[in-house]
From Swiss-Prot:
The gene is nuoC. One of its GO terms (cellular component) is NADH dehydrogenase complex. PROSITE patterns: COMPLEX1_49K. NCBIfam families: NuoC_fam, NuoD, PRK06075.1, PRK11742.1. Gene3D superfamilies: Cytochrome-c3 Hydrogenase, chain B, NADH:ubiquinone oxidoreductase, 30kDa subunit. This is NADH-quinone oxidoreductase subunit C/D. It is found in: Cell inner membrane. NDH-1 is composed of 13 different subunits. Subunits NuoB, CD, E, F, and G constitute the peripheral sector of the complex.
Amino acid sequence: MSIFTQEVSAINGQSGNIKQMLTLEMLPELKSLLSDSVEQQICIDGILTLWIDKTQLIPALRLLKTLPQPFDLLLDLFGVDERLRLDKDKLPAQDFTLVYQLCSINRNQDIRLKVALANDQAEIPSITAFWPSANWYEREAWDMFGIIFSDHPNLYRLLLPPTFKGHPLRKEFPCRATETEAFSLDDERLAIEQEALKFDPKRWGMEQSNKDNDYLFLNLGPNHPSVHGVFRIALQLDGEHIINSVPDIGYHHRGAEKIAERQTWHGFIPYTDRIDYLGGVMNNFPYILAIEQLANIQVSERVKCIRVMLAECFRILSHMLFFGTFAQDVGQLSPIFYLFIDREKLFGIIEAITGARMHPSWFRIGGLAQDLPKGWDTMMQEFVDEFPKKLDEYEVMVMQNSILKRRSIGIGQYNTQEALDWNITGAGLRATGLEWDLRKARPYSGYENYDFEVPTGHKGDAYDRCQLRVEEMRQSVKIIQQCINNMPEGEVKADHPLTTPPSQRSKHDIETLIQHFLNVSWGPVMPKGESCFAVEATKGVNAYTIISDGSNTSYRTRIRTPSFAHLQMIPKMAKGLMVADLIVILASIDFVMADVDR
């Protein structure tokens, strides 16, 4: 076994939000299996990273999933085009890399396996037999990089149209639309595109009929109000009962990961706001923390506290919308209007603090855009005093409604192991009874200093998933109250050469003005390395993996969103139920298509 340190700054850097660093010596079974052929890469995020041969991938993953304390969650799977990387001499020879990041809930540790692939041999076995959630991740890797997964059940386009040519995350694919042929949609092409989007049951292994009846195939979406976005589900029906279903995503795909390759590190912050467009600064959080971890930037306690307070405000905002739309989809129309009134009050506070409502882009590398305004605490305290009483009323109105209970209890039910197999995180996982919240398990930004509970369910059904988010709003209010009571003094921007200095300092000396000009116009040049940071976002685990080649832009930015993983489980949850039950299941997942498609 050889060990190489790709990130020199890792020795002095932070170790991410993983409590205990995993070593290969702690996994003797894996070490014995891989023998001397494995290469270990020391990464600044503290995740055990091993380069293995593709022939060892299946045995290694099988072993990791069946250990006494298994790595039972396939947190992420993605590709990297390494062909233009400047420091390839420190890496195994490859054109492409496939990255498998696994998480062990019992150990509270991650492991990252990397497989090197040549351009002319970009083929690797599928792992859908171990994790059904790998299906979409492998399809995405083929869609974006052209990597073939042998034995995959349906290796078709996922985020891009069936007629799309090329693989966008390859380095030879243009970053800008102006570098490609102008798009036009004449009648001939329109007919081709429409024909390509027709659902073919045979492609998905669906029978047209059984011995008694012909099946009905129904498109739910992509513009149905109950699918919460531009999203289609092709349903195979026997009367009103769902025999099978195929989610069809990608209509909202904007190429966020490709955009990150041409935007400066600072310039990409506003794009993160639009991933989960209901999450606000919650989207900035993992991206900023991953960069600060990479560059070893330390922020003040005041910055940490303000970030937590704003993140919890957006958690409440997101959950309020979920709560209202869940009731609306079940047929109860009043709650959403009451909740929108309270959302507007909180949006008013957000706007007073950040200058914007839904997409403030307020977090900065090394701090915040500005300090809190005068009177922020009074506004926030008024909301904290008033909202819990109203939430109690809304809970009685919605959760005690007999029709809602009959339509949601026992619907879309799954257990903890099924949730882990399908890469379910957030309230969807905690509804099964597993207390797994990164704010507690792997505290970041000072969350270890706050007193709050992690609500859990026990049935794992639609009703539990809704009830949990109600309880989470109460806990968020509790955290915000502690921020108000204990807001530290201090600067809101770190004194670091890679951060934008305060504007008042740039007016007093030319050196600071030069630094400000360079960081704003060209963007900061981050050190070489790889950094992954995950946070407990509004809908589940949101993680950013960034790869820096020592430039002012990212070489590769991977955005791991919870909604993408959660929609995969729809066919399993809906099978055997009725179309009306599917509407309840969709409402209980809590997703937005921008978070799915990126």
